[in-house]
């Protein structure tokens, strides 16, 4: 847990404060007290029968199902974690060893933000910069308004509503938040979230109103 938190909270895309001051705070305080609290929280959601976190399990299942759907022996589908294991660097090395020459990177964040999608791009570039082998590279930066994505979200909501015997007053589309100063600097994430909600409202087969809400990151930034 401590190693994961150190990697995550040392990312300059995630924490945009003076790095010297932040490293003191991080190493003296946060990494001293936070790991034990985080471990307790993880213990509550840990999938003991799979011996993995829900994030790892569902990401692995997404990768497997996409592989089955593509069903092409010449296309390798794999996954990596931005922080922790399996790392982006290790997976790129594995793909190189398999003889891959064309690399498509799909960050699993529909709405682009510098603290999520951009840091994945950073790590991909860093990994490739240390290698002599260079594949052709395509990164899918965001897909908040892709028709297939909107259709899938609408179907998921419709299926859930059909299984309950009462009608909700409202549907809340909840997203992670980002510090306001990131938005003020030009991060488009907030706009993409509202765009996704609008498109869901326009395409979903229900008269229930939909609103956008944001969950704030635990962050020293306003």
Predicted regions and their residues:
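Hydrophobic alpha-helical segments within soluble ligand-binding/sensing domains
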Residues: 147-169
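Long, hydrophobic, well-ordered secondary-structure blocks that form the structural core
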Residues: 78-152
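Short helix-capping segments at alpha-helix termini
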Residues: 70-73, 128-134, 165, 203-207
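An alpha-beta-alpha
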Residues: 164-189
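N-terminal glycine-rich anion-binding loop in soluble enzyme alpha/beta folds
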Residues: 1-76
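Conserved small/polar residues in nucleotide/adenosyl-binding loops
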Residues: 217-222
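Redox- and metal-dependent alpha/beta enzyme cores, enriched for Fe-S-associated oxidoreductases
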Residues: 180-212
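Short, structured patches in soluble enzyme cores that scaffold and shape functional sites
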Residues: 107-109, 139-142, 157, 173-177, ...
């Amino acid at each position: 847990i401590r190693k994961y938190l150190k990697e995550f909270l040392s990312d300059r895309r995630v924490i945009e404060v003076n790095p010297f001051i932040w490293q003191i705070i991080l190493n003296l305080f946060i990494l001293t007290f936070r790991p034990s609290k985080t471990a307790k929280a993880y213990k509550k959601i840990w999938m003991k029968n799979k011996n993995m976190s829900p994030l790892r399990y569902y990401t692995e299942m997404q990768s497997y199902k996409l592989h089955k759907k593509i069903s092409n022996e010449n296309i390798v589908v794999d996954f990596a974690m931005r922080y922790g294991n399996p790392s982006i660097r290790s997976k790129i090395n594995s793909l190189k060893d398999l003889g891959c020459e064309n690399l498509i990177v799909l960050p699993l964040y529909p709405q682009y933000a510098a603290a999520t999608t951009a840091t994945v791009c950073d790590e991909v570039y860093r990994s490739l910069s240390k290698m002599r082998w260079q594949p052709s590279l395509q990164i899918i930066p965001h897909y908040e308004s892709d028709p297939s994505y909107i259709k899938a979200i609408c179907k998921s909501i419709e299926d859930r509503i059909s299984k309950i015997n009462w009608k909700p007053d409202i549907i809340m589309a909840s997203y992670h938040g980002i510090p306001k100063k990131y938005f003020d600097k030009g991060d488009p994430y907030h706009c993409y979230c509202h765009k996704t909600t609008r498109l869901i409202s326009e395409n979903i087969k229900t008269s229930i109103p939909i609103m956008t809400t944001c969950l704030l990151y635990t962050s020293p930034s306003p």
